[in-house]
Amino acid sequence: MKTVVAAAAGDAGKLGVAERLGIQSDMVVQELGWDNDVDDDVRAAIEEVIGSDLLDEDSDDIVDVVLLWWRDQDGDLVDTLVDARAPLADNGVIWVLTPKTGRDGHVEPSDIAEAAPTVGLAQTSNISVSDDWAATRLASPKAAKSKR
């Protein structure tokens, strides 16, 4: 059973997003695909939980989690997932954050479902992280089985 640390009432929503993403203190998290449209509250909540800044695309560190902000016009998802997977620890996960249905840049869930196995990843869950963004969890099949 997980132990959840209580937060002040005003912080509960934003800190909860990091918990829903499975992000814990001292994890190393890399952010890819940042642009002006990302949800800064989601970013701030994750940074607060991990106790450091998110690593950018130029980092060479091994990471526990990759946050990939992805929009329909961003190019080839398979190529980007190959790049995102490179620094990932063996049991690491990639969260593909996409604009929700009806929002500019919305990505069809089938696009993610088709791209994931091409690069050796399994889609394991989907969650809402904010009013405008949804997240899809991708992991290696070995990591996916251990989290079920």
Where on the chain are the PLM-derived regions?
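S-adenosyl-L-methionine-dependent methyltransferase catalytic core, i.e., the SAM/SAH-binding region
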Residues: 1-148
